[in-house]
Design a protein with these regions (language model features):
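Glycine-rich segments within core transmembrane alpha-helices of 12-TM secondary carriers
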Residues: 147-164
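C-terminal ends and interior cores of transmembrane alpha-helices
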Residues: 89-105
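Single conserved hydrophobic/aromatic residue that forms the stacking wall/gate
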Residues: 235-243
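Transmembrane alpha-helix termini and helix-breaking/packing motifs in multi-pass membrane transporters
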Residues: 159-179
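C-terminal membrane-cytosol helix-exit motif in multi-pass small-molecule transporters
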Residues: 191-209
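Helix-loop boundary and gating motifs at the non-cytosolic
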Residues: 12-60, 241
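Juxtamembrane intracellular "pre-TM" segments in multi-pass secondary transporters
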Residues: 5-14, 208-234
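Cytoplasmic membrane-interface "Motif A"-like loop-to-helix N-cap segments
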Residues: 76-88
């Protein structure tokens, strides 16, 4: 173990990484699959046409695309641990809001508003969780748990696209009421995410290095924002060879 790893491990109020890495990255993957995949299936079952679904859901991916633009603000306000807990709470509220408004007359507009809330909350959660991963583990642990976190992120995708969609289908058949079936499914997701929020509230470690950036001025924040914005443009712009 290097001196850096030793100092790092001493600066973290220890928790066994197995107690929080799997659930943290499951919580990172589930809202993404809910917004990008389950929403499409749900709207189709609720009678929307393919054209309407494309129109309403095609922009929901935007928060994950532009999330680097507000990543400096995550460092400015509170700790990454606080952001994780807060965003998971908002995601749970998003699931509950969708569940509540599915049976209503204006369900499309109202549920879309909560899907947008979930999308921005989930993208912000990604920023905080990935940063917290670096703070909560030493170098050796970071290398070891890369595969673990990816596995549970993918498991969240399988759980969402497979088990939850199957559950909604079974409820449609057993209840004979499509809106009710999907409402129950989203209430269950809200309950699951609330449980994850409460669990992480107590189980996530408290790294001493997880602090908000002190002395960050408006000019420095603007500089970081512009650097990030330019980096995004350079990354997404086609090269002359691609043109």
């Amino acid at each position: 173990m290097t001196i850096r790893d030793t100092n790092h491990s001493m600066s973290v109020k220890r928790r066994n990484p197995w107690n929080w890495i799997p659930t943290l990255y499951f919580a990172e993957g589930l809202p993404y699959v809910a917004v990008m995949t389950i929403a499409v299936i749900m709207y189709k079952r609720l009678g929307l046409s393919n054209t309407e679904i494309t129109l309403y859901t095609s922009w929901l991916y935007l928060p994950w695309t532009i999330k680097p633009l507000w990543s400096p603000f995550v460092d400015l306000v509170k700790t990454k641990r606080s952001w994780i807990i807060a965003m998971q709470g908002l995601i749970a509220a998003g699931f509950a809001g969708i569940a509540f408004f599915i049976p209503t007359t204006h369900f499309v507009q109202l549920t879309l508003a909560f899907f947008w809330l979930m999308a921005f909350s989930s993208a912000t959660h990604d920023i905080a969780a990935d940063g917290f991963y670096m703070l909560g583990l030493n170098n050796k642990e970071q290398s070891f748990f890369v595969g673990i976190r990816n596995t549970f992120y993918r498991f969240a995708n399988i759980f969402g696209q497979g088990i939850l969609v199957m559950l909604a289908g079974w409820l449609e058949t057993s209840q004979g009421n499509i809106p009710l079936a999907w409402s129950i499914t989203f209430y269950l997701m809200a309950g699951l995410f609330l449980a994850l929020t409460l669990y992480h509230r107590f189980i996530l470690p408290h790294p001493d290095t997880d602090i908000k950036r002190e002395g960050l001025t408006a000019s420095k924040l603007l500089e970081d924002f512009l650097k990030t914005f330019i980096s995004c443009l350079l990354y997404t712009s086609p090269s002359p060879r691609d043109a």
